[in-house]
């Protein structure tokens, strides 16, 4: 299959002619306009900057998504959520989340690493524009009274960083056309990224968003309710969402 070389023009070739893993183009840049064009067509960049100093563009024809209403919360996760050990916020520490993701499995240093300075700058700019968002998971020490409030469901949506807390996990991604495009997640303690994903799904369900784009299947995401759809089904939902917003 051909891999297209992009130039400075704002365009993408038809991704249906790409490699089986979704790679179909190399080059261009990580400008805001190009990234928005990419995501509106289900295209996302990986920047293997230690191997090639140009973005690699992917668009798998087999898409792995989670529909917010279908998020699976296991019994053990429900127990963890009732314990009050963790507090969830949104857009309170985007920098901390993306840096945490970049350090996971040496995503910023290994050969083929993709989450390096160029990617971080681009998504930080998208965050400042209100397009990229983060979910943060904080480990906190609560009083017995605060724990009781958590168990009763109180304060779950408080978007305030508690005192004596540390960032132990989270995720970030792009909100566009009624969908959330997950980019990366990290955990410093067991299940922190699962907590972030559950919170995200609940948030998106309230906003009537169609799906969370997980990019590729993993056992972790499969256990949370992820499933496969075709690229045509994927784009039909994105386009319908875009038309509904007009």
Identify what each model region corresponds to.
Residues 1-246:
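N-acyltransferase acceptor-side catalytic subdomain
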């Amino acid at each position: 299959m051909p891999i297209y070389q992009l130039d400075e023009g704002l365009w993408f070739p038809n991704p249906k002619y790409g490699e089986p893993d979704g790679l179909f183009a190399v080059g261009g840049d990580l400008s805001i306009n190009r990234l928005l064009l990419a995501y509106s067509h289900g295209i996302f960049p990986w920047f293997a900057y230690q191997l090639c100093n140009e973005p690699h563009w992917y668009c798998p024809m087999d898409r792995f998504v989670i529909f917010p209403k279908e998020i699976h919360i296991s019994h053990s996760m429900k127990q963890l959520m009732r314990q009050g050990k963790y507090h969830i916020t949104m857009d309170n520490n985007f920098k901390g989340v993306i840096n945490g993701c970049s350090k996971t499995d040496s995503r910023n240093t290994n050969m083929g690493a993709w989450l390096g300075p160029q990617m971080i700058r681009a998504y930080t700019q998208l965050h400042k524009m209100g397009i990229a968002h983060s979910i943060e998971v904080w480990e906190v020490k609560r009083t017995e009274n605060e724990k009781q409030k958590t168990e009763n469901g109180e304060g779950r949506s408080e978007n305030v960083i508690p005192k004596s807390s540390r960032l132990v996990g989270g995720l970030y991604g792009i909100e566009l056309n009624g969908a959330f495009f997950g980019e990366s997640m990290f955990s410093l303690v067991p299940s922190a990224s699962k907590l972030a994903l559950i919170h995200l799904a609940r948030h998106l369900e309230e906003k009537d968003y169609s799906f969370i784009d997980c990019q590729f299947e993993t056992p972790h995401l499969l256990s949370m309710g992820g499933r496969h759809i075709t690229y045509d089904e994927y784009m039909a939902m994105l386009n319908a969402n875009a038309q509904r917003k007009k």
